[in-house]
Structure formats: C-alpha cells, structure tokens
C-alpha cells in the first residue's frame, strides 16, 4: 500500500546547512530554531514566529526560511501541533504588512487614493516572502489533502491563487455543513469566496467583518491602513477567523 504524500517527503531540513544564516538580515539562529521546531519544540516555534514575522514584518531570513517551513508543514514526521503552527506562520508571512530594509528599518505596504499599491525600494522582502510562499504552498495543500482544518483555510486565504481545486471543495464542505465551529465556518466562507475568484468590495469587507465583534469594531473604527483594497482586508479578516478557530480568543492578537 502506498504511503500518503506527507509520509513520502524527504528530510524537511535537507539543505539547511547550505544557507548562510548568520549573513542574512535577522537570520542568526534561525537554523537552530528550525531544528527545534522539527523536533516538536513549541518554544522554538514561538521564537520562529517572533524572528520571521516580527510585528507583522518579514525580512531576508523570512524569505529564505519559507522552503524549510513548507517542508515542516508538509511532513507527517513533524508533530501535528508544530505543523499547524508552521502553516499558520506561512500564511501570516504571505500576508505581512511590512518588511525590513537592509538598514533594519521597516517599510510598510501602502496604497494611493486609487487603491493601487505603491512600489517599495529593493530589497522588497514583502514581495519576495509572499512569492516564496506561493511557490511552495501546493506541497502543503497536497499533504493536507481533504483535512478539514483551520490551518488549511488560513493558507488558502493567504495564497488562493495556488490552492488546488480540492481545497475549494473542503472549504465549501466546512462553510455549508452547519456542523463546524462558527469561526472555522467564517474562515471557510472567506476562503471559498477567494478561491472562486469572487471580487471583494467595501460592502463585502463589511459583511465579512460581521464574523467577530472585535473584527467588526476594528473595521468600523478605521483601524485598517488607509486606501487598503477590500480584497486585502478580507484576507486579513479571514486569516484571523482561521486563527481564532484553531487557538481561540486568547490568541486573537497573534500576528
């Protein structure tokens, strides 16, 4: 009998020593944290989140860490709670709102009055990190298969353009079954909307915000960046719903 794809994956940290971590911006010690995560150390996971997504900010090390995070998230050799955390981290990194410059300063995503994103100076680690997640996320989706889990919805919300069809089927099943927790249903509804290529306008963003009182309060208070397109806002809301589904209200401020 053939093993599931996630069991057939190679060593998730293969090639880790070939990356010059100490030479990368914010890269010192990332290799050891990845090893700790692979061994099931949740403290190492928390440290990775802080290092690779510091206050919603990615860096050179973030982009280089993505292939290893993907393999951790796709491998059944890694404990399930670590896989979940890593997949959520990948989704959050793809949605990051800021990036570190070569001088260690933060540059944030900004939009003009027409809601077109303004260019950033190189190196643009926001774009590089998102591209890295998009490139390898299909490996995670393949490994998760039809699992009806929040981390799958979070990743689908973050990079819907690379999610295979079966993920939309999973999202549809969760959203309309009427048997799943509310936050997971909310996340699945957002994922399905994005996976079907539906347009998000301000009305849809407001409707999406109804899923949680804190999200609605933040939206009505104008706490999202000026001129941010509603599609981005919907993604951020959907990610929060998925995270709440997995970890509850006590973790609402994550990322």
Regions of interest found by a model, annotated:
Residues 11-74, 84-99, 121-129:
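Alpha-helical solenoid scaffolds in large eukaryotic transport, assembly, and signaling factors
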Residues 74-76, 80, 84-202, 208:
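Eukaryote-skewed repeat-based solenoidal scaffolds used as protein-protein interaction platforms
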Residues 193-255:
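Extended, charged low-complexity segments
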Residues 1-39, 202, 217, 221-233, ...:
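Long, low-complexity, highly charged intrinsically disordered regions
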């Amino acid at each position: 009998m053939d093993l599931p794809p996630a069991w057939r994956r190679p060593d998730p940290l293969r090639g880790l020593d070939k990356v010059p971590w100490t030479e990368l911006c914010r890269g010192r010690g990332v290799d050891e944290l990845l090893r700790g995560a692979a061994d099931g150390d949740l403290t190492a996971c928390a440290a990775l989140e802080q290092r690779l997504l510091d206050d919603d900010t990615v860096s050179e090390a973030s982009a280089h860490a993505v292939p290893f995070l993907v393999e951790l998230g796709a491998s059944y050799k890694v404990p399930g709670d670590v896989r979940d955390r890593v997949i959520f981290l990948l989704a959050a990194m793809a949605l990051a709102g800021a990036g570190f410059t070569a001088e260690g300063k933060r540059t944030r995503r900004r939009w003009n009055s027409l809601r077109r994103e303004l260019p950033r100076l190189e190196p643009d680690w926001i774009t590089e990190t998102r591209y890295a997640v998009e490139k390898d996320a299909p490996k995670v989706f393949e490994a998760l298969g039809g699992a009806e889990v929040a981390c799958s919805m979070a990743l689908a919300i973050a990079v819907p353009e690379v999610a295979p069809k079966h993920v939309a089927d999973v999202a549809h099943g969760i959203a309309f079954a009427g048997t799943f927790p509310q936050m997971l249903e909310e996340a699945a509804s957002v994922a399905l909307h994005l996976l079907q290529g539906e347009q998000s306008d301000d009305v849809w963003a407001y409707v999406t915000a109804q899923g949680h009182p804190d999200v609605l309060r933040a939206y009505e208070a104008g706490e999202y960046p000026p001129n941010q397109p509603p599609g981005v806002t919907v993604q951020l809301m959907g990610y929060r719903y998925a995270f709440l589904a997995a970890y509850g209200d006590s973790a609402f401020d994550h990322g």
